[in-house]
Amino acid sequence: MTLKASEGESGGSMHTALSDLYLEHLLQKRSRPEAVSHPLNTVTEDMYTNGSPAPGSPAQVKGQEVRKVRLIQFEKVTEEPMGITLKLNEKQSCTVARILHGGMIHRQGSLHVGDEILEINGTNVTNHSVDQLQKAMKETKGMISLKVIPNQQSRLPALQMFMRAQFDYDPKKDNLIPCKEAGLKFATGDIIQIINKDDSNWWQGRVEGSSKESAGLIPSPELQEWRVASVAQSAPSEAPSCSPFGKKKKYKDKYLAKHSSIFDQLDVVSYEEVVRLPAFKRKTLVLIGASGVGRSHIKNALLSQNPEKFVYPVPYTTRPPRKSEEDGKEYHFISTEEMTRNISANEFLEFGSYQGNMFGTKFETVHQIHKQDKIAILDIEPQTLKIVRTAELSPFIVFIAPTDQGTQTEALQQLQKDSEAIRSQYAHYFDLSLVNNGVDETLKKLQEAFDQACSSPQWVPVSWVY
């Protein structure tokens, strides 16, 4: 068994199924007619700096460069920002540095990045600072006239890229952003449509589903990863164990260390590229939470109430069977030699040792549940999320947090602390977070969310499709 879904038979078939589903979705979207809008701004006939009429676009006249100039006029009657930033180029000419998607200028289509501005309302911009020009354009109302030299570089097609945010971001708290007002605030898990990424440090994006149509600046993945890596931090403490097999032991450490190079890029998270798929069935329900938060009660309730839908994979152990235990029912009993051999062959999804005995869950056991068209329930350590979050297992990952009600005992405070440690490190993997104020309430919310996820369009990692 390998970690990549595409390398195994089961993983390959699931990868292909999701790829076909995505292709069908794209074809259906492409067949729909697209709306066309016409901006209401007024653009005059082209003029030339030497005063000549349009002569069929000569490049030079008498050895002098002919620069094509356009007069752009539009009315600004509100306090709405124009949605552009300016800069001085190497010739100290005022040029358009950035156009925010959805802003006034973007909607009009009157300016483009790189356009050189010569005059604003008849005033030459020479010898004016960028701050002065930005302020003048912001405060001006009524009819605005701009004399510009268009950027002759070819226009790139609009991006069609969506990213899932893996961190919280507030531009007002960011000292690196060039313009805090132009920043886009978002939270972990938000889907961001990337509009422009010409700037290597600051991309433009818009939160999907937001009522705000205009785009804002977000740190690029490179900038965010550099920022996080540059912050001096003390060595991170080990995440609290939430495994039913107890704390991870040397066998598991060895196993995870063997594959750590595969996931090195996940140590510093920023964004994850995603695609939107039509509804499809999630094959695995993963419960994550600190030890003692109540995951076992939730899991057992799901199994008892929905035996035809959910199945818990029977784990393997080297512990000798007790008198009342039947092989293959509570556990699969195998020798230490066989389990060690299976571990070396990467057949275990997760494993550990407890009181001198080894316990673990095999990939094949989960696959057999899927072949029965049932949903496998896993309660695993958060470190294992990197392994199970594949198209092969198609998991729906639910984080169970401790109650925020009742008396704050010392035990509850410790549980909340352990829970927050898991959340802070692994929240970008979660599809759903629930506070366990009661098993019945939590169970109802979980099942509703799971059914909704399986019956609605879903954002999934692009690696599940391509």
From Swiss-Prot:
<keyword id="KW-0007">Acetylation</keyword>
<dbReference type="InterPro" id="IPR036034">
    <property type="entry name" value="PDZ_sf"/>
</dbReference>
<feature type="modified residue" description="Phosphoserine">
    <location>
        <position position="52"/>
    </location>
</feature>
<keyword id="KW-0728">SH3 domain</keyword>
<comment type="similarity">
    <text>Belongs to the MAGUK family.</text>
</comment>
<feature type="modified residue" description="Phosphoserine">
    <location>
        <position position="19"/>
    </location>
</feature>
<feature type="domain" description="SH3">
    <location>
        <begin position="158"/>
        <end position="228"/>
    </location>
</feature>
<feature type="modified residue" description="Phosphoserine">
    <location>
        <position position="13"/>
    </location>
</feature>
<keyword id="KW-0597">Phosphoprotein</keyword>
<dbReference type="InterPro" id="IPR027417">
    <property type="entry name" value="P-loop_NTPase"/>
</dbReference>
<dbReference type="InterPro" id="IPR035475">
    <property type="entry name" value="MPP1_SH3"/>
</dbReference>
<dbReference type="InterPro" id="IPR008144">
    <property type="entry name" value="Guanylate_kin-like_dom"/>
</dbReference>
<dbReference type="GO" id="GO:0032420">
    <property type="term" value="C:stereocilium"/>
</dbReference>
<feature type="modified residue" description="Phosphoserine">
    <location>
        <position position="57"/>
    </location>
</feature>
<comment type="subunit">
    <text>Heterodimer with PALS1. Interacts with DLG5 and NF2. Interacts (via guanylate kinase-like domain) with WHRN (via third PDZ domain).</text>
</comment>
<keyword id="KW-1003">Cell membrane</keyword>
<dbReference type="Pfam" id="PF00595">
    <property type="entry name" value="PDZ"/>
</dbReference>
<keyword id="KW-0472">Membrane</keyword>
<feature type="domain" description="PDZ">
    <location>
        <begin position="71"/>
        <end position="152"/>
    </location>
</feature>
<keyword id="KW-0564">Palmitate</keyword>
<dbReference type="GO" id="GO:0034451">
    <property type="term" value="C:centriolar satellite"/>
</dbReference>
<keyword id="KW-0966">Cell projection</keyword>
<feature type="modified residue" description="N-acetylthreonine">
    <location>
        <position position="2"/>
    </location>
</feature>
<feature type="modified residue" description="Phosphoserine">
    <location>
        <position position="243"/>
    </location>
</feature>
<dbReference type="InterPro" id="IPR001452">
    <property type="entry name" value="SH3_domain"/>
</dbReference>
<keyword id="KW-0808">Transferase</keyword>
<dbReference type="GO" id="GO:0005886">
    <property type="term" value="C:plasma membrane"/>
</dbReference>
<dbReference type="GO" id="GO:0090022">
    <property type="term" value="P:regulation of neutrophil chemotaxis"/>
</dbReference>
<feature type="region of interest" description="Interaction with PALS1">
    <location>
        <begin position="268"/>
        <end position="466"/>
    </location>
</feature>
<keyword id="KW-0449">Lipoprotein</keyword>
<feature type="domain" description="Guanylate kinase-like">
    <location>
        <begin position="282"/>
        <end position="451"/>
    </location>
</feature>
<dbReference type="InterPro" id="IPR020590">
    <property type="entry name" value="Guanylate_kinase_CS"/>
</dbReference>
<dbReference type="InterPro" id="IPR036028">
    <property type="entry name" value="SH3-like_dom_sf"/>
</dbReference>
<feature type="modified residue" description="Phosphothreonine">
    <location>
        <position position="49"/>
    </location>
</feature>
<comment type="function">
    <text>Essential regulator of neutrophil polarity. Regulates neutrophil polarization by regulating AKT1 phosphorylation through a mechanism that is independent of PIK3CG activity.</text>
</comment>
<dbReference type="Pfam" id="PF00018">
    <property type="entry name" value="SH3_1"/>
</dbReference>
<dbReference type="InterPro" id="IPR001478">
    <property type="entry name" value="PDZ"/>
</dbReference>
<dbReference type="InterPro" id="IPR050716">
    <property type="entry name" value="MAGUK"/>
</dbReference>
<dbReference type="InterPro" id="IPR008145">
    <property type="entry name" value="GK/Ca_channel_bsu"/>
</dbReference>
<dbReference type="GO" id="GO:0016740">
    <property type="term" value="F:transferase activity"/>
</dbReference>
<protein>
    <recommendedName>
        <fullName>55 kDa erythrocyte membrane protein</fullName>
    </recommendedName>
</protein>
<dbReference type="GO" id="GO:0030863">
    <property type="term" value="C:cortical cytoskeleton"/>
</dbReference>
